[in-house]
């Protein structure tokens, strides 16, 4: 596995034209959703953020196929119901393509919370890991990751602070959040990891 720190490649369908999000250091940023089909036929709908100058390099149109190269980013949003971790793909390049669907991500970082190991109702072994991935300018992206089977068993025994590399795909998953005012449908974004490499355990 190549240790790139934080890299993702997506190839999918643009659901709608990008919408303005915010400006930072005189750069305008836009947000859009890319639909990436899985081999099973279902699709992950993933949020992407890109600077205006990056988008101008591609002839964007709804329903078109585009290749996105970038990083998985996160930030905490404060709301009345508490802090929420917001996940998106920060696009470094966006290009028109005819390639088949692609969703490949590699992350290198440190486990920052005790891994949570459990079995699904169907008996599948899974392990939830929160990975702290360092970024430039002393920033950190916190990326939820889920591991399966034998890799889940391996991750379950790792301590906080262990340095690991993961490879997999970024997936979207719907769930229901129960709030005092009622139930609310939400979407979670997480790395579904197929490969795990332990770099340093830091016991």
Predicted feature locations:
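Single-stranded nucleic acid-binding surfaces, predominantly the OB-fold ssDNA-binding core
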Residues: 1-203
């Amino acid at each position: 596995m190549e240790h790139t720190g934080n890299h993702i490649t997506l190839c999918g369908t643009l659901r709608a034209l990008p919408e303005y999000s915010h400006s930072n250091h005189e750069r305008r940023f836009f947000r859009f959703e890319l639909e990436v089909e899985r081999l099973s036929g279902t699709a992950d709908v993933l949020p992407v953020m890109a600077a205006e100058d990056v988008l101008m390099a591609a002839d964007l149109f709804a329903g078109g196929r585009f290749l996105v190269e970038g990083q998985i980013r996160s930030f905490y949003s404060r709301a009345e119901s508490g802090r929420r971790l917001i996940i998106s793909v920060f696009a470094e390049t966006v290009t028109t393509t005819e390639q088949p669907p692609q969703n490949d991500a590699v992350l290198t970082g440190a486990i920052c919370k005790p891994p949570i190991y459990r079995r699904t109702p169907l008996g599948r072994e899974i392990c939830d890991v929160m990975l702290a991935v360092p970024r430039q300018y002393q920033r950190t992206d916190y990326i939820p990751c889920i591991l399966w089977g034998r890799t889940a068993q391996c991750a379950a025994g790792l301590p906080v602070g262990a340095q690991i590399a993961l490879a997999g795909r970024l997936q979207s998953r719907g769930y229901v959040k129960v709030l005092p005012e009622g139930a609310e449908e939400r979407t979670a974004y997480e790395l579904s990891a197929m490969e795990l490499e332990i770099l340093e355990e830091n016991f």
